[in-house]
């Protein structure tokens, strides 16, 4: 039998990485970068585990990168422009580029959730906007901040998992 090609990867062999934004101590749900491990350069494919009380990222919108989130296991709440929408295994949320729709995914349940997250990989033309975290702008090169994001009204939800309310940023 020939050796297994490098473009076939096992999720268990790809290490998890838990991102922490500058100016914060909150670890986002850990991610396995499957697409990068398999050699993909234009499409990002990530397996993200959201333990109870975590979220996928800070709420954000992107100017020139499409993104999707598919729930493999468990239940999450999609934070969309300040409103929560329940999602369960088998549900998909898709974010076309340039709409200004801000989003993140929150696990307020009592068990892990598993998400398949995919989209474009770091396009040079892409800009990003964090509606609830404007101080993020100082951590990014000016050229990466989305200045002319389409205006969208935000709902009342603060974007935090229930377990994080009242904790240090």
Residue positions per predicted region:
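A short, N-terminal "cap"/entry segment at the start of jelly-roll beta-barrel domains
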Residues: 1-42, 128-169
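Conserved short histidine dyad/triad with adjacent acidic residue
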Residues: 28-33, 46-62, 100
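A generic structural signal for short beta-strands and their flanking turns/coil linkers
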Residues: 30, 41-46, 65-67, 74, ...
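Short, conserved beta-strand element in jelly-roll/cupin
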Residues: 47-51, 61-79, 118-121
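Short beta-strand segments
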Residues: 57, 85, 126-128
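Short hydrophobic/aromatic patches on the structural cores and recognition surfaces of FHA
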Residues: 74, 90, 105
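Short acidic-glycine-tyrosine-enriched beta hairpin
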Residues: 82-98
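Ligand-binding loop in jelly-roll beta-barrel domains
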Residues: 97-125
